[in-house]
């Protein structure tokens, strides 16, 4: 698969949230406002790209040492360290976004979309450059999905609907419709 195919696949046909259902916790928790969703998406994109690069190197070392069974544990440790770096950066340089993301920023550590992209890179046997591209494109797909969903939620929250649908019930219906829309991309032949 060429680079453009990998990018389009990560953005649309294999979107981590709407197709693979990775990263649902921040998708539902941080998607009430577009600006917060965009900040979370950018942070996740940065961590996914960096984690793809760092975990590629870690995986090479594990293969040389014959310790492939330690992949998941070490990948989580690498991701946790990267999230701490992002958290320190945001706290120092973008304190408003740091406060807006709140508890969801440290939760990027356990965001399965970040771990998912690293494991996909290893499973597909991507080289260093393609791993970074797939990580960044996967993060941009995450950002696209969460920002689209945040814009839907902002409009839905202002609408007049029955009391029993307010909050998460209507948000889940909107998420389902968004996932259904992205299912339309599954017919694309990207090779």
Task: Show which residues each predicted segment covers.
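Helix-coil boundary and interhelical linker segments in multi-pass alpha-helical membrane proteins
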Residues: 1-5, 57-70, 119-132, 187-191
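Structural signature of hydrophobic alpha-helical transmembrane segments
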Residues: 3-18, 66-81, 133-145
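Hydrophobic core segments of alpha-helical transmembrane domains in multi-pass membrane transport
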Residues: 6, 13, 44, 49-50, ...
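Juxtamembrane transmembrane-helix termini in multi-pass membrane transport proteins
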Residues: 6-43
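Generic transmembrane alpha-helix signature in multi-pass membrane proteins
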Residues: 21-29, 88-93, 104-107, 112-125
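Cytoplasmic-side transmembrane-helix entry/capping segments in multi-pass membrane proteins
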Residues: 35-46, 70-75, 97-109, 164-170
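Ordered, amphipathic secondary-structure segments that act as subunit-interaction surfaces
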Residues: 60-102
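Interfacial loop-to-transmembrane junctions
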Residues: 154-172
């Amino acid at each position: 698969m060429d680079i453009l195919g990998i990018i389009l696949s990560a953005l649309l046909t294999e979107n981590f949230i709407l197709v693979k259902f990775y990263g649902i916790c921040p998708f539902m928790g941080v998607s009430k406002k577009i600006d917060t969703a965009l900040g979370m998406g950018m942070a996740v994109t940065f961590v996914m790209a960096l984690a793809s690069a760092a975990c590629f190197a870690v995986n090479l070392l594990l293969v040389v040492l014959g310790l492939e069974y330690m992949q998941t544990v070490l990948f989580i440790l690498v991701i946790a360290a990267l999230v701490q770096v992002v958290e320190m950066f945001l706290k120092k340089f973008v304190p408003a976004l740091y406060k807006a993301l709140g508890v969801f920023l440290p939760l990027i550590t356990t965001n399965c979309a970040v771990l998912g992209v690293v494991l996909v890179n290893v499973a597909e046997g991507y080289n260093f450059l393609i791993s970074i591209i797939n990580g960044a494109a996967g993060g941009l797909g995450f950002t696209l999905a969460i920002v689209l969903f945040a814009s839907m939620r902002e409009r839905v929250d202002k609408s007049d609907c029955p009391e029993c649908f307010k909050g998460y019930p209507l948000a889940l219906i909107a998420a389902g419709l968004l996932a259904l829309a992205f299912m339309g991309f599954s017919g694309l032949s990207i090779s």
